[in-house]
Amino acid sequence: MRARLMLTSAALLLTAAGPSWQQRALSSAAPSTDKANHEWARAIVSGDPDVLSAPYEEHGIFIGPDGSVSVGKAAVRAIYASRPASVRVLKADIRSDGRAAPDPDDVYEWGTAEITVQRGAAIKEASGRYLTVWHHNGARWVITRNIAF
């Protein structure tokens, strides 16, 4: 009886000490999410639609702050490629405020993006929240849903 109790206690201790599947999913997704955020801040300034759409899954969905919906990586690329030449992004930053793993292959990320835009002589600073669903697709983590508020 005592041996069984010790064995059960040891099993519980080892289970608690090991990383949970949630932590494994978050750790696995982190390099992709961090890279995409870093590249977004640079590419939104330079206006590079290929870099901006790169993390999206082929049928990923982007919902803009105005409620517009773009379905597919090509449509997301087209949004970024359509920025008028008269609009310049002077500065951009993105901050991930949190991440959660609802299952081993999905990670929800939320945060804040800040941007400084020049239209003609007018310069405007804005910030907005975002919620992104990342999905583990084979060897990659890709965006399947992205909502900009």
Report each predicted region and the residues it spans.
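Bacterial N-terminal signal peptides that target proteins for export
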Residues: 1-7
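Short, low-complexity N-terminal intrinsically disordered segments enriched in polar/charged residues
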Residues: 4, 13-58
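Short beta-strand edge/turn micro-motifs at domain boundaries
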Residues: 21, 127-149
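Hydrophobic pocket/interface hotspot
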Residues: 40, 52-53, 60, 72, ...
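A mature extracytoplasmic/lumenal domain signature
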Residues: 56, 66, 111-113, 147
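Short solvent-exposed beta->alpha transition segments
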Residues: 56-88
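Solvent-exposed strand-loop boundary residues in beta-sheet-rich modules
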Residues: 66, 119-121, 138
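Surface-exposed, charged secondary-structure patches
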Residues: 77-123
